[in-house]
Regions:
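Hydrophobic/proline-rich hinge and linker segments of small-molecule sensing/allosteric domains
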Residues: 2, 86-109, 132, 185-202
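Bilobed "Venus flytrap"/periplasmic-binding protein-like clamshell domains
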Residues: 14-38, 99-157, 164, 266-270
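A structural signal for short loop-to-beta-strand junctions that line the ligand-binding cleft
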Residues: 19-20, 83-91, 116
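Extracytoplasmic small-molecule ligand-binding "clamshell" domains
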Residues: 28-32, 41-73
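A local structural motif
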Residues: 41-51, 133-146, 281-287
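Beta->alpha turn/N-cap motifs
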Residues: 54-56, 65-78, 143-144, 161-167
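Pocket-lining segment of extracytoplasmic ligand-binding domains
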Residues: 144-235
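Secondary-structure end/capping motifs
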Residues: 204-274
Length: 291
């Protein structure tokens, strides 16, 4: 009897797998992870601990392999490909829209050369896209939530806005100079891939595949139960009213998020290929997804 109990305990411990999971405290990520965070879906033997940090902090920690599963910028993936694979769902794409370059004064897209431009981190896709658009500018790195204020005050010539700032910038009296997602679409006829979720390569293959399935189910649950998932996500929307939060989530949680598809995967590879060709990335990277 005692031996049987010990065996059952050991078996249960062997079956239970604890994984550290990190994502940003943004309404689109909150929407994606709603079902997982609130235990609306079954996770089998997987047990997740959730950590919320801004995307550039997550990029930097991914360089150290801190988390088992983490949200990352696709730009950052170029430096993480030896540690992480991309999960097949959870991607954020701007399909004809994306990070916005804004300025306080009468600045146009042709006059960004040499300007001091605030960007939300060296490993963000926003920075990579800005470098592809205009290679010759002076980057001023800062937290994404400070950029709009610094542009409005005139401390920098322009700024690249991500997250909700893309919808609220006009309130601060600044003007749109260029939409980098729109520009990218004209250049490539592809959506601009912004960020996805990476999983550590060193994990057991079955755990990797099971995690991919759980994340996909969490996103599907949110899309199928939009109202309750949106209510949860609005808690992370940094003061946005529900309708604006809804609009933001709609931009970045959609069919692309549930499944990259061939076109989405090609967009990620194209982004990193362009980065290498233009000298922004020091090496060419082959994107690898969990299958």
């Amino acid at each position: 009897m005692q031996s049987s109990q010990i065996s059952k305990t050991n078996s249960a411990q062997a079956r239970s797998v604890k994984l550290s999971l990190a994502h940003s405290p943004d309404s689109d990520d909150a929407f994606m992870f709603y079902a997982l965070a609130t235990k609306k879906i079954k996770t089998g033997n997987l047990r997740f601990s959730h950590t919320l940090e801004d995307i550039e902090s997550l990029n930097q920690k991914a360089l150290e392999g801190v988390y088992d599963v983490t949200a990352i910028s696709f730009h950052a993936y170029a430096y993480l490909a030896d540690r992480y694979m991309l999960l097949p769902s959870g991607g954020s794409f701007g399909d004809g829209y994306g990070p916005l370059v804004v300025a306080r004064g009468p600045l146009n897209a042709q006059s960004l050369k040499g300007k001091r431009i605030a960007v939300p981190g060296k490993l963000t896709t926003a920075y990579l896209a800005m470098r592809l658009y205009e290679p010759d500018f002076e980057p001023v790195f800062m937290s994404f939530d400070r950029i709009l204020g610094r542009v409005a005050s005139g401390d920098v010539d322009a700024g690249v806005l991500i997250h909700e700032g893309q919808l609220t910038y006009a309130r601060e009296g600044v003007n749109k100079v260029v939409d980098l997602g729109e520009w990218w679409n004209r250049e490539t006829q592809l959506p601009l891939p912004l960020g996805g979720n990476g999983i550590r390569r060193t994990l057991d293959r079955r755990i990797i595949q099971q995690t991919a399935k759980v994340l996909s189910e969490s996103i599907r649950y949110g899309l199928d139960h939009r109202e309750e998932a949106l209510e949860y996500a609005t808690e992370f929307a940094r003061g946005l009213d529900p309708s604006t939060a809804d609009r933001f989530v709609s931009l970045y949680v959609n069919d692309w998020t549930l499944d990259y598809g061939e076109r989405g995967r090609r967009a990620v590879q194209t982004l990193l290929d362009r980065g290498f060709e233009r000298g922004v990335l020091s090496k060419q990277v082959k994107v690898e997804f969990v299958e």
